[in-house]
């Protein structure tokens, strides 16, 4: 029985990156032997065991055979006669197919170290096409290691296009797709994840609402990049620079979906695109089973981002109505999230990347003024029942109005 450290831990160690999880491969052992040594079996489809002391995962060496559609359509064969190289052969990328024994010796039958040094994401074998999930994984690795200069090998990208052209992607479960999206949204370059999916044809299959934005023109005055799809990924990149909040990043990604529905005769203008996008966001979130809080913020940003951009032009009554509709009184953090998404939208344009966004501070101060209205004073004044809500609304409007009068700096309307 031989034990090897495999996968991400070896890869990240060679890249001098922090190691998060350690996965071990056991060659030459049976499930019975593992149980006798005190390991606890947790794998259902193939033998994976937890170490009796540190609870790290130890998997028996195995081979896989394609028997059906999707990433789950495999028959696994685990036995003591499966070699290290046979196990590494089934892995997705060469950089993930490097093993290290207990003495620190490296085993690299598919030249993963060479590809690491060349900053190349390359498939191990043509069996790559058998697992559609690998498209999402490669896109995620491309995003994760983008800052290190990694790129996808041309022959691997060709196989990814082959998968996209088949029915395999449709076999992926919503939960698995969202899991990969969620991981990518948490990384430093989520826009690269979607760029790769667009390059290989998977975006059209898995995210048709986002794919539809590419090729849709916008006014060059406000959008020198012109293409709405390009703008969308620029906004996502800006959101990633502004915040680690994955919900804000997702909202940035889908805030302009309605532009794909703009009548051709009206292009490059997109009147009411925020509201037009709401059904598209709902459909996408339902299909992928996006968490409710993430969905709700995305709907809010789509619905209100144009108002936020034009905040200086809004009447006090309109501002308070927006606060009411979004229920910022009970969820003030939502205002911060909305403003962050709007900053990303404003900066996600060629030449606007470093511009200030005074609308954000302005709306924040409007909210603070409105939120400082004392409900107790209204009740003490003798208002009852529905009168309390009406009086509260009027006083909030008055508070915002007074703040607006103090403000002298106004920006011209900036159509996003």
Curated annotation (Swiss-Prot):
It comes from the Bacteria. CTP binds at residues 8, 11, 91, 137, 140. Mg(2+) binds at residues 21, 23. Magnesium is required for nucleotidyltransferase activity. Nickel for phosphatase activity. Its EC number is 2.7.7.72, 3.1.3.-, 3.1.4.-. ATP binds at residues 8, 11, 91, 137, 140. A single active site specifically recognizes both ATP and CTP and is responsible for their addition. Belongs to the tRNA nucleotidyltransferase/poly(A) polymerase family. Bacterial CCA-adding enzyme type 1 subfamily. This is Multifunctional CCA protein.
């Amino acid at each position: 029985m031989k034990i090897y450290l495999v996968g991400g831990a070896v890869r990240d160690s060679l890249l001098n990156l922090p190691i998060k999880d350690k996965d071990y491969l056991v060659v030459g052992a049976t499930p019975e032997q593992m149980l006798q040594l005190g390991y606890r079996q947790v794998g259902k489809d193939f033998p994976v065991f937890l170490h009796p002391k540190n609870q790290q995962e130890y998997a028996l060496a195995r081979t896989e055979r394609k028997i059906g559609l999707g990433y789950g359509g495999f028959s696994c064969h685990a036995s003591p006669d499966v070699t290290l190289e046979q196990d590494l052969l089934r892995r997705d990328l060469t950089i993930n197919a490097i093993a290290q024994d207990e003495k620190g010796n490296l085993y690299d039958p598919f030249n993963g170290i060479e590809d690491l040094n060349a900053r190349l994401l390359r498939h191990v074998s043509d069996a790559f096409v058998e697992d559609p999930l690998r498209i999402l994984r490669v896109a995620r690795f491309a995003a994760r290691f983008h800052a290190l200069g990694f790129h996808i090998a041309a022959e691997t990208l060709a196989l990814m296009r082959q998968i996209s052209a088949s029915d395999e992607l449709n076999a992926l479960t919503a939960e698995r797709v969202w899991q990969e999206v969620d991981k990518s949204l948490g990384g430093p370059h989520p826009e690269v994840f979607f760029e790769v999916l667009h390059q290989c044809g998977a975006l059209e299959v898995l995210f048709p609402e986002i794919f539809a934005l590419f090729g849709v023109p916008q006014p060059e005055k406000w959008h020198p990049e012109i293409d709405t799809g390009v703008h969308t990924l620029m906004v996502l990149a800006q959101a990633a620079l502004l915040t680690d909040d994955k919900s804000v990043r997702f909202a940035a990604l889908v805030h302009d979906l309605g532009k794909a529905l703009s009548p051709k005769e009206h292009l490059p203008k997109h009147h009411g695109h925020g509201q037009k996008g709401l059904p598209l966001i709902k459909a996408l979130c339902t299909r992928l089973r996006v968490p409710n809080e993430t969905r709700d913020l995305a709907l809010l940003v789509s619905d209100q981002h144009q108002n936020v951009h034009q905040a200086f032009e809004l009447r006090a009554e309109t501002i308070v109505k927006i606060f009411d509709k979004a229920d910022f009184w009970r969820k003030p953090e939502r205002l911060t999230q909305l403003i962050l998404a709007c900053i990303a939208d404003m900066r996600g344009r060629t030449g606007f990347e470093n511009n200030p966004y005074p609308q954000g501070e302005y709306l924040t101060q409007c909210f603070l003024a409105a939120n400082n209205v004392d409900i107790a004073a209204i009740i003490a004044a003798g208002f009852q029942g529905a009168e309390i809500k009406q009086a509260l609304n009027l006083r909030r409007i008055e508070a915002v109005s007074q703040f607006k009068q103090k403000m002298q700096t106004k920006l011209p309307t900036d159509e996003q």
